[in-house]
Amino acid sequence: MTFLLFQLLVLLRYSIGFHCKIDNNGVKSVTSKKNDDEKIVISRNWKAAISLDFIFIVFPMLLFFTVLSEWVYHGTGLLSLLVLILSVTAKRSFSGLQRGQSLSFRASVSSYRVALMLITCLCILAVDFTIFPRRYAKTETYGTSLMDLGVGSFVLANAVVSRQARDVSSGNWITGIKATAPLLLLGFIRLVTTSGVDYQVHVTEYGVHWNFFFTLAAISILTSFVNIPAKYCGLLGFAVLAGYQTWLLSGLNTYLLSDERGTDIISKNKEGVYSILGYWGMYLLGVHLGYRLFYGKHTNIRSTTSSIARVFLVSLLLWIVTILFDNYVERISRRTCNMPYVTWVLAQDLQALGIFMLSSYIPLNKLSSLEEAIDQNLLATFLLANLVTGMVNLTVDTIFASPFSSLLILTAYAFALSAIIGTIHFSGFRLKFW
């Protein structure tokens, strides 16, 4: 529902016009919607475009995550109707979707990844305030929520568009290890900074020392050592998950979900260490699905309709498998990253990706200025969000903040994040760490 809501807000935003992008020559250009979508090149107007993106995309998302959370279904229905009306009106100016006019698969994936990043950035701070519904927060043992999708969705989003999924050589394992160094560095920086300022860490999430960056680094290292063709990744991924799930049912899940911790490093970080197997299996399945659905030689990437149909069909099958696993094998658990959790993330994310691909049929659909900025600086956006979140938590007693103060702080945070990333991008910089 949240991905659909995001896409509807993007479509509504684009119907208003006035967009800024950087062309191949590094020149800023703004498209203002006038008559036949006349393109006007104007310098320094990206600030207005980013501001409109914030007003029509980011701020409404923030409201639906907090004070309007009970109205999310009503809001989605209303936005769907409004976008439908605007789409019908827009089609009068088009003789039909011409080849190359609709969003490509790559653009659809970019929009999906940006939505995931934006939702994550909003939630990691909002969850600390009382106006954020607890049903959206991460579960402690079993169950599902919006925030439970986070790390799994990041792993899958990287897998689907990885070099391995595209059947492109990624070099030897030494190259892979070097590429992992920045993730390890970020993981240690987060560990040192959180320990240095005595920042509150939920130990049951990853463990005492482990964090999200270490999980990504571990997956990258394993993939570098076991580098097999994409068409075989599905089989290996299933084998890894089946073995891990069997281990969980043999008693490992009881240990991982208990408060028992020894003095050794693995025991102190048992959730993060053991769940690597689940996330690696998920990554391998994501590589295989990306190859089979989008990049394989047998796949006609130009056939948007068939690609969308395949995505929704696989998503439906995964939903069925998830229900069966959840009822007859083990309940979904993000904390252990068991097989039901993996199939749940796959089903959710493929469904969301299908929605973004389906929106390519709507004439209004384009990447917004803010989407473009975040897409080119995904990791920088996440790091900035974590930094600001930490600063807010160290200076504000979020639990006792009033609803008005909470919304004001979250709005300022969201706007600052949008403005800074927009400034970085439209000033010609691109923050890459490897």
From Swiss-Prot:
> Keywords, A to Z?
Membrane, Signal, Transmembrane, Transmembrane helix
> What membrane topology was assigned to this protein in its record?
Multi-pass membrane protein
Which BP terms does GO give this entry?
Answer: GPI anchor biosynthetic process
Asked if Membrane is a keyword of the record, the answer is yes
The region annotated as signal peptide is 1-17
One term under GO cellular component: membrane
Cell compartment(s), UniProt:
Membrane
Please give the chief subcellular localization of this protein.
membrane
Q: Where are the transmembrane segments?
A: 48-68, 70-90, 112-132, 141-161, 173-193, 206-226, 232-252, 271-291, 305-325, 344-364, 380-400, 404-424
Transmembrane as a keyword?
yes
Q: Which Pfam families match?
A: GWT1
Molecular function (Gene Ontology), one example: O-acyltransferase activity
Question: Can you name this protein?
Answer: Uncharacterized protein At4g17910
Q: What is the native source organism of this protein?
A: Arabidopsis thaliana
